[in-house]
Amino acid sequence: MSSSLSPSSPPTSPSDADRADEHTRSGGATFSTGWPEPSCVLITARGDLDAANANDFVDWAMQHAAHAKRMVLDLSGIEFFGTAAFSALHTFNVRCAGARAEWVLVPGSAVLRLLRICDPDAMFPLCDDVDTAMAALRGESQRLLKLVAEPR
């Protein structure tokens, strides 16, 4: 892990959740963490994720994920997503499965481009935006129009 990452800790109580907002920089990317709900962490990356910082990102994410039951990984602000970043994302997925942690990925166009090539089986849980991801983790589904009435 690069020395540009500074250790930090997530909120320890629900009252701290609204105030938590942490940032760090690694290579060509900025990572931030927020706690929109006490048991859910929002981990955001902006810029470039590549061989220089992909493992730093996973370490940053897992450090905060250790204190959450649910995670949203917001990569919608990623401008370049290299194959090392895909490999790191796979590592994140495996580590979350081992920890029985739920997570959802919000990809941007650069991330989607590589996922179409490297993840044809769509193994990562994807949502279009952070709000939809949060709703999915809470178990809320999008309301669908019912075309047939159910018997009472």
What are these regions (language model features)?
Residues M1-G77, T91-R152:
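STAS-like cytosolic regulatory interaction modules
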